[in-house]
């Protein structure tokens, strides 16, 4: 058994009928050459059956502790049914990009069956040009962006010939504990929880306005800042108590509306990594600076088209991995930064420089939070209280003002070509979730010389994800136009599902 962490549990607790914390990837496979096998549901199922022991997290299901006396556990599913988890369907003619995006939007809108392991794998046939899409859908409760990519290594090979994998060391399927056993475990852990809560309060309370998931709970900002001020007055806490809050004002936008549906829309685009690197090198900024600044330009142009651009800059939530090399695989080891997005800046070069400064300041604030505070926060609240507080925060987030306007996440993907069952992966698109209080989410995967972007919005959102994708392309061209070599982007291999150029 493996227990969920506080943040893992948060990902479960904040779910409701309209908000599901699910993510996915969409791998576009090249058409099979003559004589080469086509990737079908059966081919993929057989591949998973041979390799699933390499990803034990996929063999576990949830078991809750009665009365929420402790955080839930992952236990081996002795009845794991790959015929249930691996699925397939065919797109109708003509099988273009928009049909694929609609199908993926429908897939990520459907909730998981929580009595089974929280993942699904789909083979989508019928794409134009003979391509196939493989959709890997996962729940955020057991993976973050980095650990989700680790699970993909079960599917990925470095060559079309594949590889030999070691046999499982032990059989999967340990018996799940009974309800009474879980109750006894929860009761036995209460003294430990009390000790952790006391120690956690001393370490974490001054920094909760910078720590997930507490920073989104109403009132936390006031408590943390007051604690730091008091510590400074009495000379306690050292340099950490000099940490300032973001003091970012989140402007009202046309995106500010409560979630009314669980259904999502999704779109995707691909730009060349080398083009983003050219901008990075010319201006002496980071690749993430370029991605976020490009997104700022995209959101600005889209809001201008609607006549809804606020005078103040928008605020974006940027996840930051805190995973170390010796950390266990799986789970959520992530914190977040709040960053001012210079959507109020008309000039592209100035917008990039403002983004660089905003991200630099956010990183400095993030580094100022000691590791002891992060560890202390994990045990600050008793599980039953934490779960209720998380749910309350979700209900209030759409009513008392947003934490940020949008979410932008940048995740490094495979640096070289990978293959699934012998078929080369041409593009590797991400699918994020939409949370209460946020307009939309954008995730960027870097893969094999490209930046693959996915844009997710609620079905009834005024945001059109395809317009956002087009706006991102235009925004990157604006940055390229600032370079001495001119605006022409590098030649990008056609990897869109419908085989269209552009």
Label every model-predicted segment.
Residues 1-9, 24-39, 43-438, 442-473, ...:
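Soluble acyl-CoA-dependent acyltransferase catalytic core bearing the H(X)4D motif
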Residues 6-18:
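Acidic, low-complexity proline/glycine-rich segments
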Residues 20-22:
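Short, surface-exposed loop/turn motifs at beta-strand boundaries within globular domains
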């Amino acid at each position: 058994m493996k227990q969920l962490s506080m943040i893992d549990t948060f990902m479960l607790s904040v779910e409701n009928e309209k908000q599901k914390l699910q993510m996915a990837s969409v791998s576009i496979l090249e058409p099979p050459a003559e004589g080469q096998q086509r990737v079908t549901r059966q081919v993929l199922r057989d591949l998973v059956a041979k390799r699933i022991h390499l990803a034990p997290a996929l063999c576990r299901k949830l078991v809750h502790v009665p009365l929420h006396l402790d955080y839930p556990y992952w236990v081996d599913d002795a009845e794991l049914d790959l015929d249930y988890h691996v699925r397939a369907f065919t797109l109708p003619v003509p099988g273009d990009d928009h049909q694929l995006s609609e199908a993926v939007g429908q897939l990520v809108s459907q909730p998981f069956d929580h009595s089974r392991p929280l993942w699904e794998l789909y083979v989508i046939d019928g794409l134009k040009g003979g391509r196939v899409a493989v959709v890997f859908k996962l729940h955020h409760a057991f993976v973050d962006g980095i650990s989700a990519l680790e699970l993909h290594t079960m599917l990925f090979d470095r060559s079309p010939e594949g590889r030999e994998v070691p046999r499982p060391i032990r059989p999967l399927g340990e018996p799940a504990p009974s309800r009474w056993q879980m109750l006894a475990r929860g009761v036995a852990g209460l003294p430990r929880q009390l000790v952790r809560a006391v120690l956690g309060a001393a370490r974490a309370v001054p920094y909760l306005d910078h720590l997930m998931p507490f920073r989104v709970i109403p009132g936390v900002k006031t408590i943390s800042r007051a604690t730091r001020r008091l510590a400074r007055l009495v000379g306690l806490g050292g340099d950490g108590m000099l940490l300032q809050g973001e003091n970012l004002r989140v402007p009202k936008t046309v995106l500010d509306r409560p979630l009314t549906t669980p259904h999502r829309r999704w779109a995707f685009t691909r730009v060349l990594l080398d083009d983003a690197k050219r901008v990075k090198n010319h201006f002496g900024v980071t690749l993430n600076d370029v991605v976020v600044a490009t997104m700022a330009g995209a959101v600005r142009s889209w809001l201008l088209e609607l006549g809804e651009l606020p005078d103040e800059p928008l605020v974006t939530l940027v996840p930051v991995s805190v995973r170390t090399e010796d950390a266990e695989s799986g789970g959520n080891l992530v914190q977040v930064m709040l960053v001012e997005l210079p959507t109020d800046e008309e000039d592209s070069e100035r917008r990039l420089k403002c983004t660089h400064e905003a991200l630099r300041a956010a990183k400095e604030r993030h580094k100022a939070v000691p590791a002891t505070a992060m560890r202390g926060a994990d045990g600050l609240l008793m599980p039953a209280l934490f779960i209720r507080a998380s749910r309350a925060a979700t209900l209030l987030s759409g009513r008392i003002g947003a934490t940020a306007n949008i979410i932008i996440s940048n995740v490094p993907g495979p640096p070289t070509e990978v293959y699934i069952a012998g078929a080369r992966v041409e593009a590797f698109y991400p699918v994020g979730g939409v949370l209460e209080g946020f307009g939309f989410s954008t995730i960027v995967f870097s893969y094999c010389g490209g930046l693959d972007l996915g844009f997710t919005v609620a079905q009834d959102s005024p945001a059109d994800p395809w317009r956002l994708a087009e706006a991102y392309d235009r925004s990157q061209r604006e940055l390229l136009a600032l370079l001495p070599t001119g605006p022409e982007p590098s030649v990008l291999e056609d990897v869109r599902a419908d085989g269209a150029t552009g």
